[in-house]
Amino acid sequence: RLIEYNFSGHRSEAEGVLFGCYIWDGSTWQKDEDATFGLRCSATLGSGKGTIKFERDGDAANANYKIGMDSPQLGGYAQVMDSPERNSLPMEGLTATVAAWEEPVNDLAVDTEIPLLVRVFRTDGTIIPVSIDAFLEPENSKAVQKSVYAEAYTVIFCYEM
């Protein structure tokens, strides 16, 4: 239910964080502008540390994720990522497979989009494993290609907001 990412700035000049949400349209990832949000640091991230959290808001396969962030430079913040299309998926036979970034985000690559989580849905009761690489190489992901709905969440540590 809870996925956490620890990050550290290691003298980063990042001044903010942008979270992105992408929806698979059958051929490419489309950015959901309504689900994109950013946070501005009170100072540059510097050598600061923090945690990004994805927490499922319920037990249903298509439950919303609440994205939270905790950092001395950014404070605490949480936002629920809602999707009417995902919420309307039929519950009978619905399965979800999740892939997550598996390592701490150290030595931040500023202004680089980092995929943190990919989630794919099927309605035939089967599960196809998915990897985080499905965001950058969806054409090589059977799970994304055969999904009825897929979403990806990313983060960008930014020089300017």
Model-derived features with residue positions:
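Structured domain cores in non-transmembrane regions
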Residues: 11-92
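Glycine-rich, aromatic-bearing surface loops/beta-hairpins
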Residues: 109-161
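Intrinsically disordered, low-complexity segments enriched in Gly and acidic/Ser/Thr residues
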Residues: 77-124
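Short edge beta-strand/loop segments characteristic of extracellular beta-sandwich folds
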Residues: 4-8
